[in-house]
Amino acid sequence: MTEQALLSELDRLVSEERNPRTMDIDLLSSLAIVRRINDEDHLVPAAVEQVLPQVAQAVDKVVDAFRVGGRLIYLGAGTSGRLGVLDASECPPTFSVPEGMVIGLIAGGVDALQHAIEGAEDDPSLGESDLRNIGLTSHDVVVGIAVSGRTPYVIGGLAYAESIGATTVALSCNPDSTIATMAEIAISPVVGPEILTGSTRLKSGTAQKLVLNMLTTASMIRIGKTYENLMVDVSATNNKLVARASRIVMQATGCGAGEAKRVLALTDNEVKLAILITITGMPVDEARKALKNAGGFLRQAINANKA
């Protein structure tokens, strides 16, 4: 693409427009600057609210994928890629899902998490090759993340995903973007011009983070990773999380700290199992079987085995 063509393309993007509400921001005090930023940030949840039906559609597709052994895969460059990697990396400790069930891919690879990798996002073939390298299948869901909706790395990845029958989702912050027209589901929260012109790590990045939070959290809730609003599948891998596990058992059952600690010791810190045993009085082996019979849904296991 020529420089003139690129300039023309950027001129059409809402995310590249100048914000009339922040034209004087370089004249303001520190407090006034952060107030102005905060004012703009208030626009983000409203923009996300407009696309909740599309987010819910994507959640349903992710749940369907998980149920047949498929994966959720994020694909992005720069800030968009980093946000995908961040969200994916939180899933194993939060929900005790295996590494690789949710994957974040970023143009330029791991080095791009800390450093700008020049040109990595400009090659559509790299998006395809990164998906090939993880063995993408038709059971997977690929979420292409790009504020502009025109990042070649993401376009190439989504095109490949579509070609093999994987579910495709586009997350951008410009209406009718290139990736939005490509994907099966388009999620396009339009937050308007940034506080600093073109700095899409700001409002656009915040909108993306909110949507990614929803995709994984809602999907994990739907496959039984919570009980009420408690993270009952949390992996107790450090002192803080061991304490959290005890607290969750106490909150779910009303038992004391000593009892929670005792039952967690019996279950090797499996919170779901500890709660089921505490509420029903079942032996460990029977409780484990009951939980399996309920498909991992703790509420169902409790209801089926209450005295």
From Swiss-Prot:
NCBIfam families: N-acetylmuramic acid 6-phosphate etherase, PRK05441.1, PRK12570.1. The keyword Acetylation does not apply. It catalyses: N-acetyl-D-muramate 6-phosphate + H2O = N-acetyl-D-glucosamine 6-phosphate + (R)-lactate. HAMAP family: MurQ. Specifically catalyzes the cleavage of the D-lactyl ether substituent of MurNAc 6-phosphate, producing GlcNAc 6-phosphate and D-lactate. Together with AnmK, is also required for the utilization of anhydro-N-acetylmuramic acid (anhMurNAc) either imported from the medium or derived from its own cell wall murein, and thus plays a role in cell wall recycling. Pathway: Amino-sugar metabolism; 1,6-anhydro-N-acetylmuramate degradation; Amino-sugar metabolism; N-acetylmuramate degradation; Cell wall biogenesis; peptidoglycan recycling. Homodimer. It comes from Brucella anthropi (strain ATCC 49188 / DSM 6882 / CCUG 24695 / JCM 21032 / LMG 3331 / NBRC 15819 / NCTC 12168 / Alc 37) (Ochrobactrum anthropi). Residues 62-225 form the SIS domain. One of its GO terms (molecular function) is carbon-oxygen lyase activity. A lyase-type mechanism (elimination/hydration) is suggested for the cleavage of the lactyl ether bond of MurNAc 6-phosphate, with the formation of an alpha,beta-unsaturated aldehyde intermediate with (E)-stereochemistry, followed by the syn addition of water to give product. The gene is murQ. This is N-acetylmuramic acid 6-phosphate etherase.
